[in-house]
């Protein structure tokens, strides 16, 4: 399924049905009086977060969503039928923005969370409502209230426990493929990953979700490369995993490039808990490993771990370090498979 994390949508709630002008007409009843019914309410437009979706691709093929209008009232005091609501089903983690793309109208972060986007119009009163002591036969009724037209933006920010960061070709997708059932595209050229990938990782009977976003380059926050538009997907992460390519010519510069982009992007990304890892150590000897780790620790001011996604050396230790930094309430117990009773 193709990935889409931003969509423009046009919505309209239903108009209310018109009230009815009608009079009771029966045999032997000369002055029956008014009996016009009210119009039905127009349908409303809602957005609801549902499970099982991680893209807004459906909104590329349908951008217009119009709720039903209410049915006009009828004689014999019959009210019109209400218009049916329409529900936009979106992935968990979807932000709903106003037309200016800045004002946040709602943030759907839980399954089943629902928000009203456009309320349907009220139905008009029939002429029965206007009967009074001085006006026994009113010939007026109210029109239904008009529906609401508006344009909104849907912006998806994936909800994951860990966000994978690094320059292009730092080995992020290789790490995700080695630790989960996710199968991102892996190749020996920059920007192999063109959209975020999610993988469920298990360690010590606990599972958590890792998001792999396209690699960042210097100036990404100004629109260079493709990574800056995906940084929003790691805003919700509890911890960031920063992979530094051990085969790079200047890994300290690589480290500062990513940190600089986090600071320039804002949103407190640079202040999130972070695990820094020297990757691709399968290509380094012991002396090179020690030298590069010391360089990175000096640059980062904190501990640096080592691993190789290709050979899986050090991967388990990195996963345990991530688990220790994720809030306990965000971790899920790994389901234990029930053993089947032996049968001959």
From Swiss-Prot:
Q: Which domain of life is it from?
A: Bacteria
- Return the SUPFAM superfamilies for the record: Obg GTP-binding protein N-terminal domain, P-loop containing nucleoside triphosphate hydrolases
User: Record's Pfam families?
Assistant: GTP1_OBG, MMR_HSR1
Which EC numbers characterise this protein's activity in its record? 3.6.5.-
Q: Which InterPro entries match?
A: G_OBG, GTP-bd, GTP-bd_Obg/CgtA, GTP1_OBG_dom, GTP1_OBG_dom_sf, OBG_GTPase, P-loop_NTPase, Small_GTP-bd
Q: What is its main location?
A: cytoplasm
- Residue ranges constituting the OBG-type G domain according to the UniProt record: 160-327
Keywords annotated in UniProt: Cytoplasm, GTP-binding, Hydrolase, Magnesium, Metal-binding, Nucleotide-binding
One GO BP on record is: ribosome biogenesis
Q: Where does Mg(2+) bind?
A: 173, 193
Per its UniProt record, the required cofactor names are: Mg(2+)
Q: Which GO terms describe its cellular component?
A: cytoplasm
For molecular function, the Gene Ontology terms on record are:
GTP binding; GTPase activity; magnesium ion binding
Amino-acid positions noted as binding GTP in the UniProt annotation, renumbered to this chain? 166-173, 191-195, 212-215, 279-282, 308-310
By sequence similarity, the record places it as follows: Belongs to the TRAFAC class OBG-HflX-like GTPase superfamily. OBG GTPase family.
Q: Quaternary form?
A: Monomer.
Q: Which NCBIfam families match?
A: Obg_CgtA (TIGR02729), PRK12297.1 (NF008955), PRK12299.1 (NF008956), small_GTP (TIGR00231)
Record-given protein name: GTPase Obg
Q: Which organism is it from?
A: Ruegeria pomeroyi (strain ATCC 700808 / DSM 15171 / DSS-3) (Silicibacter pomeroyi)
Taxonomy, top ranks, is:
Bacteria, Pseudomonadati, Pseudomonadota, Alphaproteobacteria, Rhodobacterales
This chain is encoded by the gene named obg
